[in-house]
């Protein structure tokens, strides 16, 4: 693999097309693919209202302390520092997306949201589309897994937006095991959209959410996280779908209070990074192995290169089998 940071970025902007020929026909369910957790949170807006999914205690906290409260919230809610374009160029191919409307918005605009509102959905999708236009053999997974204040008319608007932005690059639903890089390249598909809402049953290019399970450890303890990840990967072989391993720690209220001014990255992510990276490097992709791996602050600890490198173990296996 490329040794310098600059070479790494160049390599990983087209890492899928750079994989060995022996991996082009392997189902994408069997490859190791780096993804980002709360992918849009690089652009959480402190000037925005609090998201509708937040509990009353948070709403009251913000109403009393205003901008100061939102600045502190951002330190814990923003899990990424790179925008979509930078993530794509660095090698990220899976995006964890949460959609919300703003209260009393006459335009019915759709936003990415996690506690506070982020960029508009259209802005984000257009960034992704621009990247794909100049990287024709790269493929992305868009996982729309939370919807806040989203009614049927908003779902219809989002579906139309996806059609407009991506057009013929949207891959219709087929058996997950059929989807390889070779299959997608031949048909010129670049986008798989997973949609955790019954609307997925009505639209040919919306893959049902159950085809992208992403079990969540919900712990601040790195050891418990690793045990959970290991158990969920073992359980994965019974599903026959894509699969997300969320290598992320979730702060409790007490954790936030202890490190309220330092934030998620400094208080939790950086401290746990060595053990999380050790687990990733010990994994192998394949039918019973890891598939999509997501993290907070994906630029840390050579996370992206570590995940992509796992695919080269598959190549060694393929060569040894021939």
Curated annotation (Swiss-Prot):
Protein source organism: Danio rerio
InterPro entries noted in UniProt: PI-PLC_domain, PLC-like_Pdiesterase_TIM-brl, PLCXD1/2/3, PLipase_C_PInositol-sp_X_dom
Name by which UniProt lists this protein: PI-PLC X domain-containing protein 3
Active site: 37, 114
Residues covered by the PI-PLC X-box domain: 22-197
Domain of life: Eukaryota
Segments traversing the membrane: none
Gene assigned in the entry: plcxd3
SUPFAM superfamilies assigned: PLC-like phosphodiesterases
Pfam families given in the database record: PI-PLC-X
Keywords: Hydrolase, Lipid degradation, Lipid metabolism, Transducer
Residue ranges of coiled coil: none
Single Gene Ontology MF annotation: phosphoric diester hydrolase activity
Cellular component GO terms, alphabetical: synapse
């Amino acid at each position: 693999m490329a040794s310098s940071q600059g070479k790494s970025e160049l390599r990983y902007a087209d890492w899928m097309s750079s994989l060995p020929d022996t991996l082009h026909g392997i189902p994408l369910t069997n490859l190791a693919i780096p993804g980002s957790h709360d992918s849009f949170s690089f652009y959480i807006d402190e000037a925005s209202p609090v998201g509708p999914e937040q509990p009353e205690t948070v709403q009251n906290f913000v109403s009393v302390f205003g901008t100061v409260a939102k600045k502190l919230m951002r330190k814990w809610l923003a899990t990424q520092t790179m925008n979509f374009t930078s993530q794509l160029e660095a090698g990220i191919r899976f995006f964890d997306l949460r959609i919300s409307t703003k209260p009393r918005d006459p335009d019915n605009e759709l936003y990415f949201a996690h506690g506070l509102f982020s960029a508009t959905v259209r802005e984000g999708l257009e960034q992704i589309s621009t990247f794909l236009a100049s990287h024709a053999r790269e493929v992305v997974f868009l996982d729309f897994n939370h919807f806040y204040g989203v009614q049927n008319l908003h779902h219809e608007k989002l579906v139309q937006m996806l059609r407009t932005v991506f057009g013929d690059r949207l891959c219709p639903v087929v058996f997950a095991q059929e989807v390889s890089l070779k299959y997608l390249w031949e048909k010129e598909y670049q986008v798989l959209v997973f949609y955790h809402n019954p609307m997925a049953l009505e639209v040919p290019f919306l893959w049902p959410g159950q085809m992208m399970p992403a079990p969540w450890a919900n712990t601040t303890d790195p050891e418990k996280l690793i045990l959970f990840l290991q158990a969920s990967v073992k359980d994965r072989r019974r599903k026959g779908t894509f699969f997300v391993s969320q290598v992320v720690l979730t702060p409790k209220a007490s954790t936030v209070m202890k490190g309220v001014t330092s934030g998620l990255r400094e208080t939790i992510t950086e401290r746990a990074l060595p053990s999380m990276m050790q687990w990733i490097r010990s994994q192998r992709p394949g039918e019973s192995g890891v598939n999509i791996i997501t993290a907070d602050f994906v630029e840390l600890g050579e996370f992206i290169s570590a995940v992509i490198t796992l695919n080269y173990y598959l190549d060694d296996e393929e060569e040894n089998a021939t």
